Amino acid sequence: MYGTPLPNTERDTLAPPTTANRTTAANWPVTGQRLAGSGTTLRRVNDERDDHPAPAADDHPHGESARPRPRSTDPLELGFTPRKPVPWLAPFLLISTGIRTLLAVLFGAYLDKRELQNAFGDDVFQQAGPDGGLWLDYVADLGDGFHATYSVAYLLAQPALTVDGHRLPRAQTLVMGGDQVYPSAAYEEYENRCKGPYQAALPTTPPERPTLFAVPGNHDWYDGLTAFLRLFVRSRDRNFAGWRTGQSRSYFAVELPAGWWLLGVDDQSGSYLDDPQLAYFDEVARRLGPESKVILAGPSPTWVKAADSPMAYDSIDYFIRTIIDPTGAQVRLLLSGDLHHYARYAGPNRQLITCGGGGAYLYPTHKLPERIEVPPRDTLARRASVSQPYDLVARYPDAARSRRYGWGIFARLPFRNPGFTTLLGILHTLLMLAMAGATTNWADSTDQRLFSVPLVLMVLVTVLAAVLFAKPPNASGKRHARHWLLGVGHGVAQVALATGGTWVWLALPFYGWPWPLPAVAAVVLYGPIIGLVASQLVAAYLLVAGSLGVNVNELFAGQGIEDSKSFLRLRIDPDGTLTIYPIGVDRVSRDWQVNPDQSATASWLTPKAPLTPRLTEPPIVLP
C-alpha cells in the first residue's frame, strides 16, 4: 500500500507548446463513431493515422456475456466464486504479501512492462454524452470481499440513483482508480473479486454503451501488470462486463466536454514515470491550451503520504510541472484511491480527493493531517513547484465514527483472522513450555528436550517479531523513535503475558503428568485460550499504537470493516461546470436475492434490504 517514489530525471527543458502546434478538437483527425443508441461518443483521436480502429458499434452488442441469467447463487451459474474479505493478518498471507512486496522492490524494474507498451497504440480518446455534457464515475480499491464490492458495483450499474434529492443517471464513463484486486494480481482473483461482481451488476452492455478506463495500483503491479493488461488493455473483445474497455496502455488520456481532460498516470507503485509514458503525455500536451482544465488520476494520494515521506509527491509534481504547466492548462482536480476512505483537501485553485471506498477494508480518517503543504517544503527535488497550503475540508466516515471503528479491533481481530490467533497460540505455547522447562527442569528425557525450545531464543524471537510488526521507518521516511519503543514495549508485554501464563500453568496439575501428556494438554487446552488472550493484547497494542500514528493500517486491516464505502459521480455540463457528487454507503448489503426474470441489463442479484446511498458532503462545484 505504501511506496516511496524516486525522483524523475529533471526534464525542465521541455519547451512549452506553441500556438502553432496546438490544434483544436474541431480540426483533429478523428477515428471511431457514435455508439449504438443515443449514448456516449467514444472516439480515438490520432495524428493523421488510425492504426487501432475503434470496434464497430455492433461488435458485441450485449457485452461479453452470453451466460443465461442465474437462478441461484451457485458459482457454476454465476460464473465466479464470491469471496470473503481478505484476512489481512493471516500468517500465510502476511508472509506471501511480504515476499511479493520484497520481490516488487528488488525486481520491479525487471518486471516493468511499461517500456514494452511503447509498441501498443498511443490513442487519445474523446468522451461526450448526447447532450454535450458527460456523467463520469470514479471508484477505487474495489476487488475485495463480495458484499462490499458488489454493493458498490450494484449502485454504479443502476440506470439512475436518487441521492439526497439529486437524480444522478448512470455514468457514461467509469474510471477505476487502482487496486482492482486483492491480495495479489492473480487472474483468478480478478475474475472472482472484481470482474465477476461487476458482471453480475451490469451483465450486458446497455444502449448508452458506457466506457471503462483503469489505473493500476500497487496490488495490480504484483505480477508486473500481466493480468491487468490482459483484462483492461486488449485489442480484441474490449468488454468488461457491461462496460467497454477503451485504453491501449496502462495509462490514458481522454478529452472530455467543454475543455476538460482526464489523464490517468501509472507510476509503478510510486517509483517513477517511464520514458514512453512521458513521451505519450508530451504528445497529449500538444493538444492542451490555456483554456484546458485537467483531472489527473493517479494510483495513490501522494499529497497525504508526503507528510511522512517527502519524496512521495515528486513524480506527480514533476508530471504537472513539466508536462501540463508549460501548456497553460490548469490541473483543477487530483483523484486517487489507495487509502480506503473519502477525503478532500481544498487549495487555492485545486481539489485533492482520495476516494478508495470501492470495496476494500475501511482505512481511518481521524489520523489525517488537518493541513498539508503540496509539494512539501522538505522535498529533495531540485526544482519542485511552489508549495501551496491545502486544508482538509471533508472526510468520510467522520473522525468520531472513525475512532469508534478503531475500538472494534477487540471483537473483530480474533474472528476475522483465526490463523493469526492460532499463530499466537502456537508461539505462546512454545514460550510457556520453554519457561516451564527452565523453571522446573522437567525436560529430562531426550523426547522432552526435542520439544523444549531454548528460553532465550523464544524471548528474542517474540521481541523481534513485535518490533518488526511495528514497522520502524526506513531511511527513505521520517524516523520516529515511537515505532521502536512501541515495538519493544509490545514484545515485552507478550513475554510478560507468557510469564503469567506459565505461572498459571504450573499451578495446574498438567505439568506433573507423564510425558508426552503435558505437551498434549498444552496444545489442546493452553494453546487456544492463550491465543485468544494474546490476540486481545495485540488488539490493545494496535489501539494504543494507532493513536500515536503507528500500525494505523494494521488496526483497520485486522478488522476488515466492510461498511462506509464510497465512490464519486461527476457531471460535466456543456458550459464547462464540473459538479462532484461524493456518495457514501453507510452499510453495505449482506443479504442478496437472485433476479432471474428481468431485462438483460438488470443486475443478477439485488439486495433484500435497499441500499441507501447518501452524499458525504454537499456537491462540489468547479466552474
Regions picked out by a protein language model, each given a short descriptive name:
Residues 2-3, 7-8, 14, 22, ...:
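Acidic, histidine-bearing metal-coordination/catalytic regions of metal-dependent phosphoesterases
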Residues 133-144, 259-269, 295-299, 350-358, ...:
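Active-site-proximal beta-strand elements of phosphoester/diester hydrolases
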Residues 139-140, 173-179, 208-218, 265, ...:
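Active-site neighborhood of phospho(di)ester-bond hydrolases with catalytic His/Asp-centered motifs
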Residues 145-147, 182-185, 216-225, 270-273, ...:
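Active-site environment of divalent metal-dependent phosphoester hydrolases
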Residues 147, 269-277, 289-332, 409, ...:
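Active-site-proximal segments of metal-dependent phosphoesterases and phosphodiesterases across multiple
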Residues 214, 311-376, 532-565:
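Conserved beta-sheet core of the metallophosphoesterase superfamily
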Residues 244-246, 263-268, 273-276, 305, ...:
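Membrane-interfacial catalytic/cofactor-binding modules of polytopic membrane enzymes
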Residues 273-276, 363-365, 589-595:
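A short, polar/proline- and glycine-enriched secondary-structure boundary/capping micro-motif
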